[in-house]
């Protein structure tokens, strides 16, 4: 029918003819490169194309071929020789003409329309604009209908008549040779032969041929006979279920489709639909299948199929299973701060919330703090005051292991404003390979054991637990004459082995050596009860490990007065008086009672004091 002189690239498949069969487009442009590009776009859009580089050749093609050979002409405005306007005037309305140019000039657009062009396009044209040029052909066909026919038709009938006017003729009937008859299958073969010999329907939308037949019948007796396609449409039976049909997909390419079941569109799960699904799932408690869930979702106004619900249910159950496995893995992890039972640290499992003292005025001093179970059994009380909380136990190893293993779960116990700062309180070498008491510095700045500080910042023994430290550690120094003790945190300590090592030869005793960092095989617990005779003099100081760093009597006096505020001493107290300083000592059975309100530095009337252990009196 049409001349396809455009080169189709390899691999490109031309679409099938639409409801016009295939519109034939005559393209005219003196730019050969753009002409080939435009021809290719038209071919891929489903049109038959003939291209010419001059208006003279295009006019010659229109004159030589029948009237319906070209359905539309596309021409450039500016061409050498005969331009687009000259070609438009020579065609004289026989074929609809679309004019195009590079410039989008309003004057040019108005001029082309006023001269009879059906449309004006700007170069370069897009494939979307090319695809819908069939609308101009349809509009031109509608305008060409007879006046008497158009007045008696509805708007929909106008469209049907225009389509019928350009409908292609039906293809010739296919005649197949008859196959040799076989016994038993004659009736079936005759039926198949009759079906093959029937004429296939033309590719015309439903209702178009009937409307066209009505148009031709209304022309009267003097009109010519309708085309064969229209006459055949008037006699054609109505379409049955399952028969092929033609559908318009937004372009002129209408393909014949069978009466198969239509594919449902894909359902997109949104937040609203998923919320309704979860609500239905939880209401049924996973006891019903997709059918019940679908019914509950329909109550919320969400309509889905059973297959869609089943697919979403499988995905949701898989997601729940993965979340459950993640939760189990997290809860069973040994590093999980919330998993106390699975922790491998033995010391950690023995820490609990309880109180060291269960009776008396100080029963609530340590209430609500993590306390080791051994703190109440061995009599050696060690405290560490931190910003996160006070930990009370028997030794620094327990505290260090507890803090270093679980500092991320219970808050950082080693850090700023903490008495333990990147070093162990009672160990030889810290976790970062530093001596705990290198160069005489016990811990952090402002510690109770450095620079002679009386314990204003970072003090090891706090006010609220001093009495318990005294009662737990003091009896180890009783029973022998006491001499002035040396500093507890000096460079003379042998390899800094012990933080509380007694360097005074007068008070040195196998049982009074280091109670925590034991470097002597003969040493014992500091809590072993020993009798100590209290000495007298201006330099008398009790060798209390918990009161390390008190290098002068003034600091000692200030600290003791600040700690023993009120009635805290009772009978069984031995007081050593040297005029300006008093020191206290208790045996293992000493009762912490009350202190006279005058304080420890005031002069006592009687210089005779009774030893709480053996009742011996001590001289002034």
UniProtKB/Swiss-Prot annotation:
One of its GO terms (cellular component) is nucleus. It is found in: Nucleus. Pfam families: Response_reg (PF00072). Residues 431-456, 603-620 have a biased composition (Polar residues). Transmembrane segments: none annotated. Residues 24-138 form the Response regulatory domain. Residues 171-197, 215-257, 431-457, 501-523, 596-620 are annotated as: Disordered. Transcriptional activator that binds specific DNA sequence. Functions as a response regulator involved in His-to-Asp phosphorelay signal transduction system. Phosphorylation of the Asp residue in the receiver domain activates the ability of the protein to promote the transcription of target genes. May directly activate some type-A response regulators in response to cytokinins. NCBIfam families: myb_SHAQKYF (TIGR01557). Belongs to the ARR family. Type-B subfamily. This is Two-component response regulator ORR27. It comes from Oryza sativa subsp. japonica. The gene is RR27.
């Amino acid at each position: 029918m049409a001349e396809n002189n455009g080169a189709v690239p390899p691999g490109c498949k031309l679409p099938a003819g639409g409801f016009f069969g295939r519109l034939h487009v005559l393209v005219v442009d003196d730019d050969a490169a753009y002409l080939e590009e435009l021809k290719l776009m038209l071919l891929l859009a489903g049109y038959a194309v003939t291209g010419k580089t001059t208006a003279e050749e295009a006019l010659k093609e229109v004159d030589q071929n029948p009237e319906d050979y070209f359905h539309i002409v596309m021409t450039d405005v500016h061409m050498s020789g005969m331009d687009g306007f000259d070609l438009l005037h020579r065609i004289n309305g026989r074929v609809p003409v679309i004019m195009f140019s590079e410039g989008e000039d309003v004057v040019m657009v108005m001029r082309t329309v006023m001269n009879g062009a059906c449309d004006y396009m700007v170069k370069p044209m897009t494939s979307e604009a090319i695809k819908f040029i069939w609308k101009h052909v349809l509009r031109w066909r509608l305008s060409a209908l007879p006046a008497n026919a158009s007045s008696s038709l509805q708007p929909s009938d106008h469209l049907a008549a225009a389509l019928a006017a350009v409908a292609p003729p039906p293809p010739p009937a296919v005649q197949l040779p008859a196959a040799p008859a076989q016994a038993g299958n004659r009736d079936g073969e005759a039926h198949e032969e009759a079906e093959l010999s029937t004429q296939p329907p033309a590719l015309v939308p439903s209702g178009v041929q009937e409307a066209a037949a009505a148009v031709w019948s209304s022309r009267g007796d003097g009109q010519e006979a309708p085309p064969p396609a229209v006459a055949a449409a008037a006699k054609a039976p109505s379409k049955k279920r399952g028969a092929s049909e033609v559908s318009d997909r937004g372009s002129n390419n209408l393909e014949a489709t069978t009466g198969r079941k239509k594919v449902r569109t894909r359902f997109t799960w949104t937040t609203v639909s998923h919320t309704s699904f979860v609500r239905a799932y939880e209401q049924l408690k996973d006891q019903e299948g997709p059918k019940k869930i679908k019914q509950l979702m329909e109550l919320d106004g969400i309509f889905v199929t059973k297959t869609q619900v089943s697919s979403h249910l499988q995905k949701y159950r898989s997601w729940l299973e993965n979340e459950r496995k993640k939760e189990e893995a997290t809860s069973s992890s040994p590093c999980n701060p919330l998993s106390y039972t699975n922790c491998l640290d033995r010391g950690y499992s023995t820490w609990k919330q309880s109180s060291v003292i269960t009776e008396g005025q100080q029963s609530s001093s340590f209430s609500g703090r993590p306390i080791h179970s051994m703190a109440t059994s061995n009599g050696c009380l060690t405290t560490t005051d931190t910003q996160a909380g006070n930990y009370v136990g028997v030794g620094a190893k327990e505290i260090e292991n507890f803090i270093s293993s679980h500092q991320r779960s219970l808050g950082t116990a080693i850090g700023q404003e903490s008495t333990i700062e990147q070093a162990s309180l009672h160990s030889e070498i810290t976790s970062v390979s530093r001596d705990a008491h290198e160069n005489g510095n016990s811990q952090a700045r402002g510690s109770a054991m450095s620079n002679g500080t009386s314990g204003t910042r970072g003090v090891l023994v706090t006010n609220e637990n001093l009495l318990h430290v005294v009662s737990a550690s003091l009896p180890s120094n009783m029973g022998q004459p006491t001499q002035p003790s040396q500093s507890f945190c000096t460079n003379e300590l042998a390899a800094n082995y012990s933080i509380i090592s007694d360097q005074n030869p007068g008070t040195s005793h196998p049982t009074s050596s280091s109670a925590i960092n034991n470097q002597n095989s003969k040493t014992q617990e500091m809590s072993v009860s020993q009798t100590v005779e209290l000495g007298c003099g201006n330099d008398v100081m009790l060798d209390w490990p918990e009161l390390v760093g008190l290098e002068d009597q003034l600091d000692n006096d200030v600290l003791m007065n600040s700690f023993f505020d009120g009635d805290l001493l009772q009978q069984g107290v031995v007081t050593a008086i040297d005029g300006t300083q008093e020191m206290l000592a208790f045996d293992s059975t000493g009762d912490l009672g009350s202190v006279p309100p005058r304080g420890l530095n005031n002069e006592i009337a009687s210089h005779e004091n009774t030893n709480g252990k053996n009742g011996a009196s001590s001289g002034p």
